């Protein structure tokens, strides 16, 4: 006679084991107190930043009534991004990365306090909003190379995949939850308190980073200079795998980034301008889902091929989104696009950590972030221009098709990317 309770218990254990295989691997948080402190500190800081950016856009529009004035905020991000990120990467490779990130966070505190002070005035001015946001963006750009190159110094190589997924959770959670929290705060509290809360979030990051060990790439590293910055670009050009996945992602973002068209899609395709928030949220929701269920990614061996496939998935989903007539289908397709993009991002991070020597990682991470942040802006420009000349459907659908075609061409041009695997350093 079968022991039914024993069979049932075994089935439950088997189900739990299968389910745990999909769950986010939190081993780096459990085993590495330094990484845990950095992760929590960055998470708090990121959510505060997302909230403050929504509040800033709201305040600029309230003071000016101009969408152009709101759009000009992007220049306070783009200019430091294109000019200071690679400089900051060279600084991160020359000095203690912990100290570089502390300077970054203190600079962001100063900018946030400036925004709070302006908001506390009886008649807030517009120009300080741009000045203080530029200060925040400049500080962030200088420190982002150090920030993104800390993980491989704090985590064992066998846990790079898990650490990359954990890092993506904080950014995607902020992207999904930050705007909603900002909306509630704007409704119920004065803006100065929102900005003060942002400054406190940076203080949380400062407290976490201050407790980290000293993190230097090399004790005898050269001082940052123009030649050291150029060396970073030369290194990227000399590495076909890194250059290949940089170009694959750039291709996907330039041809397949339709977010500038979301307001028009909500208004003209779905008949309700208020639905635009759901369109913006859907890709982030798909990306967050991937991060939370990223366990199977540790079994991916041919990570370069994975980047090409998931970038192509983004393109296919975006092309289909261009034809979607129902809101639910549009949201599913955008979430699927976000899912593909996030898998690609995690795989790219792991490859970057494994290939790049630590004395070059700050510069390469800075170049990568510049590419990741700038390419979507170019993509939105392309999508908007093409839509104005043709139609929403053609702009979005053709962009998705061009993304897939570009991925296939780049895969053929960079066979080393397709061959890249990490069998020797496979996840445990």
Task: Locate each region found by the language model.
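Alpha-helical transmembrane-bundle signature of multi-pass membrane transport and export proteins
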Residues: 1-428
């Amino acid at each position: 006679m079968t022991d039914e309770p024993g069979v049932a218990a075994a089935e439950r254990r088997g189900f739990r084991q299968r389910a745990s295989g999909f769950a986010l691997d939190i081993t780096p948080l459990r085993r590495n107190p330094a990484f845990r402190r950095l992760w929590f500190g960055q998470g708090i800081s990121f959510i505060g930043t997302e909230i403050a950016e929504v509040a800033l856009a709201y305040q600029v529009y309230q003071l000016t009534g101009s969408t152009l004035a709101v759009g000009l905020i992007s220049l306070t991000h783009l200019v430091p991004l294109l000019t200071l990120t690679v400089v900051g990467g060279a600084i991160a490779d020359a000095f203690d990365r912990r100290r570089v990130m502390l300077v970054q966070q203190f600079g962001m505190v100063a900018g946030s306090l400036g925004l709070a002070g302006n908001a506390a005035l009886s008649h807030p001015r517009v120009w300080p909003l741009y000045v203080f946001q530029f200060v925040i963006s400049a500080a962030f750009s200088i420190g982002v190379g150090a920030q993104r190159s800390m993980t491989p110094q704090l985590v064992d190589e066998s846990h790079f995949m898990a650490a990359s997924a954990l890092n993506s959770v904080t950014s995607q959670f902020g992207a999904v939850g930050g705007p909603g929290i900002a909306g509630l705060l704007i409704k119920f509290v004065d803006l100065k308190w929102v900005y003060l809360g942002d400054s406190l979030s940076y203080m949380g990051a400062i407290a976490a980073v201050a407790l980290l060990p000293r993190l230097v790439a090399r004790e005898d590293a050269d001082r940052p200079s123009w030649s050291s910055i150029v060396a970073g670009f030369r290194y990227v050009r000399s590495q076909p795998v890194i250059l290949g996945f940089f170009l694959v992602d750039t291709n996907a973002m330039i041809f397949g980034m339709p977010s500038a068209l979301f307001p028009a899609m909500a208004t003209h395709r779905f008949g309700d301008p208020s639905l635009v928030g759901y369109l913006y949220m859907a890709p982030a929701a798909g990306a967050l889902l991937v991060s939370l269920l990223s366990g199977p990614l540790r079994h991916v061996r041919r990570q370069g091929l994975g980047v090409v496939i998931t970038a192509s998935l983004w393109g296919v989903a975006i092309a289909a989104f261009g034809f979607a007539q129902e809101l639910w289908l549009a949201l599913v397709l955008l979430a699927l696009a976000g899912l593909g993009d996030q898998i690609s991002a995690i795989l790219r991070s792991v490859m970057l950590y494994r290939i790049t020597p630590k004395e070059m990682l700050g510069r390469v991470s800075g170049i990568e972030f510049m590419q990741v942040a700038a390419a979507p802006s170019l993509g939105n420009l392309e999508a908007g221009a093409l839509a104005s000349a043709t139609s929403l459907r053609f702009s979005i659908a053709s962009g998705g098709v061009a993304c897939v075609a570009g991925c296939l061409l780049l895969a053929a041009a960079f066979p080393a990317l397709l061959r890249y695997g990490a069998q020797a350093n496979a996840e445990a």
